[in-house]
């Protein structure tokens, strides 16, 4: 896929510990973000339940999927908005890691945790 740690842009979709909540206590997304950033990976967050100001106040780099691009998306939370999200307009998106196994097959390679990789053929 030609991704380099020094230039890849990763977006974590959802920071809550479970879907449709704003509770981030013990959220695996927080740990994952810290690991990625320690490795030098440019990491952003998109969570429709929080405002950009709230995300910045919590120390996150907000991402707006309507007008920004990224290389990798990691689904960290199963907010209902993510289940029907249209990823097709994100032209630079290389693949999605679906940590909650909520996405249907798409034209973008999707892999879920504990499942075989899948993509529309």
Regions found by a protein language model. Give the residues of each.
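Structural/interface elements that position substrates and couple domains in central-metabolism enzymes
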Residues: 1-121
């Amino acid at each position: 896929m030609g991704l380099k740690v020094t230039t890849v842009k990763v977006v974590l979709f959802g920071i809550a510990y479970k879907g449709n909540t704003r509770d981030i206590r013990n959220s695996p997304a927080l740990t994952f973000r810290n690991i990625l950033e320690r490795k030098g990976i440019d990491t952003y967050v998109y969570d429709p339940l929080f405002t950009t100001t709230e995300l910045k106040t919590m120390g996150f780099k907000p991402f707006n999927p309507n007008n920004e691009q990224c290389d990798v998306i990691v689904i960290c939370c199963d907010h209902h908005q993510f289940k029907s999200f249209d990823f097709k307009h994100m032209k630079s998106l290389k693949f999605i890691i679906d940590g909650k196994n909520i996405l249907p097959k798409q034209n973008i390679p999707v892999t879920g945790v504990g499942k075989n990789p899948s993509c529309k053929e």
